[in-house]
Amino acid sequence: MKKVKVCSPGTSANLGPGYDIFGLALSKPYDILEVEKTEKGIIISVEGEKAEEIPTNVDENTAGVVAKKMMEDFNIQSGIHIHINKGIKPGSGLGSSSASCAGVAFALNELFELKLSKLELVKYSSLGEAVAAGAPHADNVAPAIFGGFTLTTSYDPLEVLHIPVDIEVLVALPNIQVSTKTAREILPKEIPIKYMVNNVGKAAGMVYALYNNDLELFGRYMSKDCVVEPCRANLIDGYAEVKEKVKDLVYGITISGSGPAIITIPKKEHVIDIENIFKEVWNCPVYYTKVGPGCYVEEIE
């Protein structure tokens, strides 16, 4: 095997009360990564969404950091060329950096037949997230690897729970810049216990709703975060207006990851109405998609 081509999905993390725990893999948008064996070194090339803003230096690129660590750990002597076709806009709140991290970990596992488990791939992938967010975290890379709905319940040791689900979502991507680091820094270091009780209860209710295929309950609890969303809402102009306008058209709405992307669980009969509101307020791209698989191989040479 000389070359592998991998599809790595966009993801939505947090989902309201599940901060740094919950994640969903999306069928679109997605990145395509091609990893090819070379004689030596790691070369990175990028095309697609905001490609000119993505560093190709190995130690500054999320995929590069992951690849370097894996190649060191497994004493891989050959070089590689990583080509990333970005379909996920960086800084969107849809797991753009995570797609690169997970995609390259998955590709190297295939290319060099490392036989790593999905959990081990999540662990390696999360290391690259430190470049984008300042610290390793797995709430995006876990669904990018596992697909479906994931819960990262522990970091030391790393534990990920996976639930296959069939949910349609409607995502808006406002043309607003939100820094992941800034969005994390503005969060409170301590919260009242009543807020903890609310979020734990709502997060538990969301898992219950998934097992009972109850979209109404899932969406209602997704919209009830009282810790993270209130802090980040002001970073997204128009969010309060949109939330009010779509409240009767969706089962739930919240900020995707750090934002600015907004994820909704739409009532099917109102999808077009919601899209029109998104475009009226933000004039932005909209994705009507569903929860999808994790990384998968498209081609092998």
Swiss-Prot record:
Highest taxon of source: Archaea
Sequence positions that bind ATP: K89, P90, G91, S92, G93, L94, G95, S96, S97, S98, A99
One family name in Pfam for this protein: GHMP_kinases_C
GO molecular function, one term: ATP binding
Protein keywords: Amino-acid biosynthesis, ATP-binding, Cytoplasm, Kinase, Nucleotide-binding, Threonine biosynthesis, Transferase
Reactions accelerated catalytically: L-homoserine + ATP = O-phospho-L-homoserine + ADP + H(+)
EC number, UniProt record: 2.7.1.39
InterPro entries: GHMP_kinase_C_dom, GHMP_kinase_C_sf, GHMP_kinase_N_dom, GHMP_knse_ATP-bd_CS, Homoserine_kinase, Ribosomal_Su5_D2-typ_SF, Ribsml_uS5_D2-typ_fold_subgr
Pathway(s) served: Amino-acid biosynthesis; L-threonine biosynthesis; L-threonine from L-aspartate: step 4/5
Gene Ontology cellular component terms for the protein in this record: cytoplasm
BP terms from Gene Ontology: threonine biosynthetic process
Subcellular location(s) of the protein: Cytoplasm
Main location: cytoplasm
Annotated Gene3D superfamilies: 3.30.230.10, GHMP kinase, C-terminal domain
Function in brief: Catalyzes the ATP-dependent phosphorylation of L-homoserine to L-homoserine phosphate.
Family as reported in the entry's similarity comment: Belongs to the GHMP kinase family. Homoserine kinase subfamily.
UniProt protein name: Homoserine kinase
